[in-house]
Design a protein with these regions (language model features):
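Conserved SAM-binding loop of SAM-dependent methyltransferases across substrates and taxa
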Residues: 213-240
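Conserved class I S-adenosyl-L-methionine
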Residues: 201-212
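A short SAM/SAH-binding and catalytic strip from SAM-dependent methyltransferases
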Residues: 292-309
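N-terminal mitochondrial targeting presequence
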Residues: 1-56
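S-adenosyl-L-methionine
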Residues: 253-290
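Conserved beta-strand signature within the Rossmann-like core of class I S-adenosyl-L-methionine
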Residues: 322-332
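C-terminal lobe and adjacent flexible extensions of AdoMet/dcAdoMet transferase-like proteins
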Residues: 399-521
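Class I SAM-dependent methyltransferase Rossmann-like catalytic core
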Residues: 158-198
Length: 521
């Protein structure tokens, strides 16, 4: 009986599913393709274009824009191009003195060796976290606008444990944001000092207070090189091409120093000796007569020191190091400028005290090379109440990693800085202050010709006989001969050396000139 009941249950179940089978058969029968339609060829082309556009619309998100590739420049045809001739004619418009006084390096481009080192560092890091760290350290507020980014590093942590957790991340963010900006400003100052002091000024050893991730190290390596200036390709410059023999970096911020060491791991250094230490030691001192090729420098570090006593101690260490050239750089803020002005005042005071002591040194005293044209009191320095800042600006062509870290599409940025370059020895004295060499350029020559033409007396035409011998008028002969002067008797090198000595007394523009208003120092 149980078996019969089970058979009836299965039979009823099969009857319930029969419509579904019939529906399946009907669907299968109607699934045959319809015969193709004979469409007009123009309509077929239109449908094909629409299909292609819809297919492209559903593709994956757009790929990021490609970066520019560095193509080696062929210098063989440089002299024959019209572009170079146009540049030379444009430079000839200025007088030699104006050209010497206005020479600058332009926008700074980070060498590929440094870019590759920083790119490798960023590749090994957490990029979203890197952007957050960069905003936390170098941006004021939550907005991603470029105007809120700064290059000052003044972070303070509550405990050593917190400092230890953040030091590697902070160092990576510093190398991605602050190092390129600091590098450009330091390069600008060193190149200007090199221009002002002449080809005889060479540096083989650098002592750096506030080394951080090595901004000064890289800038010094790319400023002092073995080849002549015409043969150097700065973008492809390598550490091995530098004439620097020794570098001492002094900094207590272990996180920044560790990143600075990592940036040098894959670089070929040859015989360059690099040392990192937490403080200045007595054995770092150099005898005074051996310091002619030694540079003592501190860049963007004075503002990070806790008080004036620490800043004063740093400046004294630079003076006692034995280096003949001392450079201090800080941000072009009120605080940064006051730090530079106070350091300048202290160095001049130490130099004056040394001259008055009567002790015999191989070189005594000191003087300001740049930017001041004097060794007197700074007219803009009023501690605590000053509003004016003696500052300068340097443009940097942003590498790709800077734009990506800041989430910005702008290809350049400007960094403001204040600085002073001090050199041991008394200030050069100009014996003849009335000489003004190199004051006439192409524009001045055209004006002189116009004045001569205006003074020329109009002469009447006379009949000329072929039998008469040609006679040159004395006035015409005098005009055709160049006027004698010191400029014509000097070679370009001699003229540049004379202008270099004369530039010690040239006034400096300390503010952007306004219409009919110029402020000089």
């Amino acid at each position: 009986m149980y078996t019969a009941h089970w058979r009836r249950h299965i039979s009823n179940s099969l009857l319930k599913y029969r419509p579904a089978r019939n529906f399946s058969q009907t669907t299968s029968a109607s699934s045959h393709l319809n015969p193709p339609l004979n469409l007009d060829p123009s309509l077929q082309a239109l449908l094909k274009d629409v299909d292609i556009s819809l297919t492209r619309h559903n593709l994956s998100p757009r790929a990021p824009p490609k970066e520019l590739d560095v193509v080696p420049y062929d210098h063989s045809n440089e002299s024959s191009t019209d572009f170079v001739d146009e540049i030379e004619s444009e430079l000839d418009r200025k007088s030699p003195a104006a050209l010497f006084g206005s020479q600058r390096i332009g926008a700074v481009v980070l060498p590929l060796e440094l870019q590759n080192s920083i790119n490798l560092l960023i590749t090994e890091s957490d990029k979203p976290q890197l952007h957050l760290d960069a905003k936390r350290l170098f941006q004021d507020g939550e907005d991603d606008s470029d105007g809120d980014w700064f290059a000052a590093y003044n972070v303070k942590y509550r405990s050593h444990q917190q400092n230890y957790r953040h030091r590697e991340r902070d160092g990576t963010a510093f190398a991605s944001v602050a190092l390129p900006a600091h590098y450009s400003a330091i390069r600008s100052v060193l190149e200007h000092a090199k221009h002002r002091l002449g080809p005889d000024w060479s540096i083989s050893r650098v002592i750096d207070w506030g080394a951080a991730t090595g901004s000064t190290l890289w800038a010094s390596l790319h400023t002092f090189y073995q080849k002549s200036g015409d043969e150097v390709d700065i973008e492809g410059f390598k550490i091995a091409d530098s004439s620097l023999a020794s570098y001492v970096g002094i900094d207590k911020r272990d996180g920044l120093v560790s990143i600075g060491k990592r940036l040098l791991q894959n670089a070929e250094r040859n015989e360059l000796n690099i040392q990192w230490q937490r403080s200045y030691r007595e054995d770092d001192r150099i005898p005074r007569d051996e310091g002619h090729d030694v540079l003592a420098i501190s860049a963007f570090h004075l503002s990070s020191l806790p008080n004036g006593l620490a800043r004063k101690q740093l400046v004294k260490e630079m003076w006692e190091s034995g280096a003949h050239t001392m450079v201090l750089i800080d941000h072009s803020t009120t605080n940064g400028f006051e730090n530079i002005a106070a350091a300048r005042e202290l160095l001049l005071k130490l130099g004056k005290k040394e001259l008055e002591s009567g002790e015999e040194w191989s070189v005594s005293g000191c003087h300001v090379v740049a930017p001041c044209p004097h060794d007197g009191k700074c007219p803009l320095y009023h501690p605590g109440s000053g509003r004016s800042v003696c500052g300068f600006s340097q443009r940097l062509q942003r590498p790709s990693f800077v734009r990506r870290t800041k989430h910005s599409g702008i290809g350049h940025e400007d960094i403001g800085y204040s600085y002073v370059v001090v050199k041991r020895g008394t200030r050069p004295v100009i014996t003849n202050t009335n000489t003004k060499l190199g004051r006439v350029g192409a524009v001045g020559m055209r004006e002189l010709r116009k004045q001569n033409e205006a003074r020329t007396v109009v002469k009447e035409l006379t009949l000329h006989s072929e039998d008469e011998a040609p006679v040159e008028d004395q006035a015409d002969a005098a005009e055709s001969e160049p006027a004698p002067g010191p400029l014509l008797n000097r070679s370009p090198d001699d003229l540049e050396n004379a202008l270099r000595q004369e530039a010690y007394s040239w006034p400096r523009l300390v503010f952007n000139p306004l219409k009919k208003v110029v402020t000089l120092s």
